[in-house]
A protein has these predicted regions:
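Short amphipathic alpha-helical segments and helix-helix/interface helices
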Residues: 22-26, 99-107, 135
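Structural alpha-beta junctions
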Residues: 30-34, 55-59, 105-114, 139-142
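Short, well-ordered secondary-structure micro-motifs
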Residues: 47-49, 74, 93-94, 124-128
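Conserved nucleotide-binding/hydrolysis micro-motifs of P-loop NTPases
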Residues: 41-44, 69, 88-89, 119-123, ...
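Phosphate-binding/switch region of NTP-binding enzymes
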Residues: 108-181
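Conserved P-loop
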Residues: 2-72
Length: 181
């Protein structure tokens, strides 16, 4: 996930997608750029991830509930970031209304956008890879798809796309990438 791509971050349960989005947001806030967070935000997680920022940096963070009116006033400029945490329901398929709402948001945004959703898992307990809700449609809207999951047998997270894979470990200052042995 480089610093300019707009991304659909598909995550498994307990994979810390919100923490990773906060870490990305922190980089923007530290640089004096605006971050708009659309959706739920855990106060305790936000405190631990960005609570050390000064008031001026935190003043560039806007948090709105998904579906709120007047969202156009929230949009960051081109050097900012829009995070839409949980763009669709975590159960079943994304509804037509959810896809249309996301499409409207993406059409308004002139900045980098990161949207998250819980990945679909094999209900039968099979070992198939998780799948992304409305993947083709979202990629058609300009979002690259990344998958975030917990590694088997360890505390690491694995971030993968169609052509990349990265292992992450969480430390006191957030996530860092680790090299394969």
């Amino acid at each position: 996930m480089n610093n300019t791509d707009s991304v659909h971050l598909v995550h498994g349960p307990g994979s810390d997608a919100e923490a990773i989005c906060l870490q990305v947001s922190k980089g923007y806030l530290e640089s004096g750029q605006m971050v708009a967070w659309l959706g739920s935000l855990s106060p305790s997680l936000a405190r631990s991830a960005i609570g050390d920022l000064d008031g001026a940096a935190l003043g560039n963070l806007r948090v709105w509930e998904k579906g709120a009116l007047g969202i156009h006033r929230l949009m960051p400029p081109s050097n900012g970031l829009l995070v839409m945490h949980g763009w669709c329901s975590p159960i079943g398929r994304a509804t037509k209304a959810e896809v249309q709402y996301l499409e409207e948001i993406l059409q308004m945004a002139v900045c980098r956008v990161v949207v998250t959703s819980l990945g679909n898992q094999d209900a039968g307990g099979g070992r198939t890879q998780m799948t992304a809700r409305s993947r083709e449609r979202l990629e058609g809207m300009g979002l690259s798809t990344w998958f975030l999951s917990r590694s088997e047998g360890g505390p690491e997270r694995v971030l993968t796309s169609s052509d990349s894979s990265l292992r992450l470990v969480r430390g006191q200052d957030g996530f860092t990438s680790i090299r394969e042995p």
